[in-house]
């Protein structure tokens, strides 16, 4: 994994079209993520609870966590892995995820996190694309892990199963060697820390190259508006493999020495039990969880009075839902943020002390961020108004948290990153005189299902492998519980008796559950432009 430039050369010439964060710039330490999070650990910190395993209640202190991180770094270095290597991590939210993630980074290894719901086919794609030399997983996900590893020729000895499985090394076996953490040095501005996969504004999933500085910067930027405390208790149900869970929950909590209660999956009853039993104070959620808290009768039967902040992200969160949540959680600040994997991920947050900003907005630019709003039809800049709200336009952002680019995809990188360092988000926004942004539409084709990204192009390519499908197109259609669901428009080959259930089953066997096609409509032809581009607007208008 080669090193590359992390901070874009953003043109800071005075320009009325450039919108700046109203918050003064914050200092970003020029250190590795490990040093940023763990170097200042003092004796008092060492005894504080860092992690609680939600199902069992087992605890890990900050001292134990750092010792485990160092030991894991030594174990993987002893296997010949270090700077320039990529290791994949396929795991739900368990305490070991945190230790392994930071142990790998401590050794200078780049981590590519894989969705815990991924199929074997999807695991293989990411292993191959990222060039991963090893895979770390848990026994519950071993079938997908083994299928993916076998497909790319990865040896069983390179598939580490944290809790043990026949034929694979376990974490305990790796740590038995007692190897000290390696002495590695690298430039945090250029050394790649993580490779999460994102579809960006369009197309197939791509490796997002994020440096140590990107991740450090975004923790500091977010903390300016959403300060956590040493006394906060945070249920961690949003997956750590997703950039939101990785940066805002995991790294943000460690930075402030808060306690994380890990939950491997979302189950409303279990989530409510954890909030009540552990007196949770801050909830980071996606809109489907917020909806459950607002509407489900089970939430009314629990004591949730300890919650002081609820922050929603990963998908649109309207003002009506925010009001419903606030009604169920009196005294709780209900906030919203915005971001994307390519920004590590946070670019906007409603500051916790700005009660004047509507929770239906995504808030203000975080410190050290610049933005432009551009008319997508003309390319003309739309200025922030002196009063009222601007016309809608595409949001572009620049800052120290913006990715280097996409792994091995120069064209996609050029399409997404402007030469002056501004990133195309593909989202249509307005901005008001106070600097609050509201997302009003999406240029990009991605489907947002329960906060997960679903790329239509990926499902279309899969559908076209079916021998009885002549052509196909996929769009997202509104769904009150999940935000959007994938709908497939399918052209059958002549004489085919293919049914909607056949199509749904074909896709379901090969993708993660959130990518399943939920609606199928058979059509005579898929509408396309003269250049062959699918006319999704026509499909949405049907």
Residue ranges and their predicted role:
Residues 216-233, 241-282, 296:
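Conserved AMP-binding/adenylation subdomain of ANL enzymes
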Residues 15, 58, 143-189, 199, ...:
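ANL superfamily adenylate-forming
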Residues 118, 135-137, 283, 399, ...:
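AMP-binding/adenylate-forming catalytic core of the ANL superfamily
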Residues 280-284, 296-357, 370:
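Gly/Ser/Thr-rich phosphate-binding loop
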Residues 59-63, 193-217:
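Conserved AMP-binding A3 loop
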């Amino acid at each position: 994994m080669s090193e590359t430039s992390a901070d874009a050369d953003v043109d800071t010439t005075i320009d009325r079209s450039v919108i700046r964060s109203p918050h003064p710039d914050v200092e970003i330490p020029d250190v590795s993520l490990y040093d940023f999070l763990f170097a200042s650990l003092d004796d008092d910190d060492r005894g504080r609870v860092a992690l609680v395993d939600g199902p069992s209640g087992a605890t890990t202190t900050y001292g134990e966590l750092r010792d485990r991180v160092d030991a894991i770094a030594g174990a993987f270095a002893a296997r010949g892995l270090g700077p320039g290597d990529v290791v994949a991590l396929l795991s739900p939210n368990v305490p070991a995820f945190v230790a392994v993630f930071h142990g790998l980074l401590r050794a200078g290894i780049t981590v590519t996190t894989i969705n815990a719901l991924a199929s074997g086919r999807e695991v293989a794609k990411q292993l191959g694309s990222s060039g991963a030399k090893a895979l770390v997983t848990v026994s519950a996900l071993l079938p997908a892990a083994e299928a993916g590893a076998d497909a790319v020729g990865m040896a069983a000895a390179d598939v580490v199963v944290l809790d043990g499985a026949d034929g694979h090394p376990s974490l305990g076996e790796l740590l038995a060697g007692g190897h000290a953490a390696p002495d590695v040095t690298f430039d945090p501005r250029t050394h790649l820390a993580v490779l999460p996969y994102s579809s960006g504004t369009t197309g197939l999933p791509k490796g997002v190259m994020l440096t140590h500085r990107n991740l450090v910067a975004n923790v500091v930027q977010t903390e300016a508006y959403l300060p956590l405390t040493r006394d906060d208790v945070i249920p961690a149900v949003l997956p750590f493999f997703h950039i939101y869970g990785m940066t805002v929950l995991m790294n943000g909590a460690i930075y402030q020495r808060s306690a994380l209660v890990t939950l491997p999956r979302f189950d409303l009853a279990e989530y409510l039990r954890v909030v009540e039993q552990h007196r949770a104070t801050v909830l980071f959620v996606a809109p489907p969880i917020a909806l459950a808290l607002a509407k489900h009768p089970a939430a009314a039967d629990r004591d949730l009075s300890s919650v002081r902040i609820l922050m929603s992200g990963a998908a649109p969160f309207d003002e009506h839902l925010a009001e419903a949540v606030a009604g169920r959680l009196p005294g709780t600040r209900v906030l919203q943020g915005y971001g994307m994997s390519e920004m590590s991920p946070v670019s906007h947050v409603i500051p916790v002390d700005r009660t004047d900003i509507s929770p239906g907005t995504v808030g203000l630019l975080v410190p050290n961020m610049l933005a432009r709003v551009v008319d997508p039809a003309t390319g003309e800049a739309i200025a922030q108004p002196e009063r009222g709200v601007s016309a809608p336009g595409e949001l572009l952002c620049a800052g120290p948290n913006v990715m280097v680019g996409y792994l091995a995809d120069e064209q996609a990188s050029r399409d997404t990153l402007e030469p002056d360092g501004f990133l195309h988000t593909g989202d249509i926004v307005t901005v008001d005189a106070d600097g609050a942004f509201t997302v009003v539409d999406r240029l990009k084709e991605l489907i947002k299902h329960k906060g997960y990204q679903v790329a239509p192009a990926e499902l279309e390519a899969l559908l076209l492998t079916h021998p009885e499908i002549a052509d196909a197109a996929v769009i997202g259609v509104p769904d009150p519980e999940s935000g959007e669901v994938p709908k497939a428009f399918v052209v059958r080959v002549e004489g085919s008796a293919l049914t909607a259930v056949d199509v749904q089953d074909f896709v379901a066997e090969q993708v993660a559950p959130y990518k399943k096609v939920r609606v199928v409509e058979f059509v005579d032809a898929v509408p396309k432009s003269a250049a062959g581009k699918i006319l999704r607007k026509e499909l949405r208008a049907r």
